[in-house]
Amino acid sequence: MAVFSSLTPVFVAVLCVIIGFLFKNSQRKESRSKQKPSDQTARPWVDEDLQDDTEISTKDNEENNEDWMDTTDEENLPHVPYSPVQYSVSEMLDRSERFYTLMNLRRSVRFISPEPVPKEVIDNVIRTAGTAPSGAHTEPWTFVVVSDTDVKHRIREIIEEEEEINYKQRMGNKWVQDLKRLRTNWVKEYLDVAPYLILVFKQAYGILPSGKKKTHYYNEISVSISCGILLAALQNAGLVTVTTTPLNCGPQLRSLLQRPANEKLLMLLPVGFPASDAKVPDLKRKDLNDIMVLV
């Protein structure tokens, strides 16, 4: 009995070591399972540079009141009569059908000609994009137009380096497989060839000449709407592009183009005429009944 009593602390110690080992081993396995998601549960990788607090709460403004603009100065904004052009029913039908026909020809074109494009045309399509509605009319967009050969090539280098990582590591097998039929990869030759690159930045908040910040409500939605109008303006001008969302390239491109910290890259559009040998996938659009619900 005395021997058993003397051995009891030893048994307890050994038992504690075994339990501790088993617990630690189970934690290690659980950690590995979390770090390596299966193909079934993997989700498309998200651009972390765009993950910011775009909606400023009242509490945030109260805590940092001195840093933010007082909007009471704009309360007496004058209002003016609005009288748009009105068309007859037949004119409305004709204009809407012709515009649809024009836009239905729009395609994502990755084969772009180096043929020069008049700068005035680019000015006009950017000006048109700037007519988009925005939260509280903050117009939270910046369109950086690049035509310099060296800068375009540096942009290509940055994007291709990150895109190769995206395709091989971040995007996941399902995303990569879904893109195979479109024959896309991380090589972006059009970034060198296109006469212009338009980089669209959203302004997470505004910065006034006084240094104070201005709240930009729904800035990403507002800038996305302006991108849609920009695509329509390019199509109307007879130009082509392909919508490019260079994941994880925002900080490097922002630095290259010397943009402030409040601007986040949302989209990049190479712009020009289609190459003479340009090809696009033979895709069909959804029928009206598949995209519209009438209540």
Curated annotation (Swiss-Prot):
The enzyme's E.C. designation: 1.21.1.1
Gene3D superfamilies membership: NADH Oxidase
Coiled-coil intervals, chain numbering: none
Residue numbers spanned by region Disordered: 29-81
Localization per record: Membrane
Signal peptide: none
GO cellular component: plasma membrane
Biased composition (Acidic residues): 63-75
CDD domains: iodotyrosine_dehalogenase (cd02144)
InterPro entries: Nitroreductase (IPR029479), Nitroreductase-like (IPR000415), Nitroreductase/BluB (IPR050627)
GO molecular function, one term: FMN binding
Membrane topology: Single-pass membrane protein
Main function: Catalyzes the dehalogenation of halotyrosines such as 3,5-diiodo-L-tyrosine. Likely to also catalyze the dehalogenation of other halotyrosines such as 3-bromo-L-tyrosine, 3-chloro-L-tyrosine and 3-iodo-L-tyrosine.
Protein name: Iodotyrosine deiodinase
Organism this protein belongs to: Danio rerio (Zebrafish)
